[in-house]
Amino acid sequence: MLLTEIDHIAIAVKDLEAAIAYYAEAFGAEVHHREIVESDGVEEALVKVADSYIQLTAATRPDSPIAKSIEKRGEGLHHVGYRVDNCQEALDAMIAAGATPIDKAPRPGSRGTTVAFIHPKGSFGTLIELVQENPGSGH
């Protein structure tokens, strides 16, 4: 099976600190990992709620994909991250099934992972991130 589980649900936010505080108060969420991803122009906080992970993501520059998403659609659901054993194989399978890739090849992601994004136009309106854990990466 190419997709093994949901890795995370990503929420685009304007104010990362306010979002972290809200999820902590409302759901008892704890920050599990925090990172600035310069290449994507974002700062993210991976919070754990029960057995699930929510990636709160804020723009660090106005030209980042998160800034553009918030400008166009407002804050809210950004993408679903699916865990895969092999990012390249999963990307190839999705393209063969008719998906439109944003990333033509897997690339480094946060937490030491390897990732590739699939455009919403080819996946029924949902931005998809394929997430491959590597040795030393993961939650």
Role assignments for model-derived ranges:
Residues 1-20, 75-84, 132-139:
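N-terminal beta-strand motif that seeds the catalytic metal site of vicinal oxygen chelate
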Residues 2, 45-46, 55, 82, ...:
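Vicinal oxygen chelate
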Residues 5-7, 29-41, 60-78, 93, ...:
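A cross-kingdom feature marking solvent-exposed beta-strand/loop segments within repeated
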Residues 6, 13, 23, 47, ...:
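Short, structured motif recognition centered on aromatic/hydrophobic residues
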Residues 19, 29-30, 54-55, 62-65, ...:
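Short loop/beta submotifs within extracellular cysteine-rich repeat domains
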Residues 19-24, 94:
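Conserved active-site tyrosine of GNAT-family acetyltransferases
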Residues 37-53:
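C-terminal "cap" of GNAT-fold acetyltransferases
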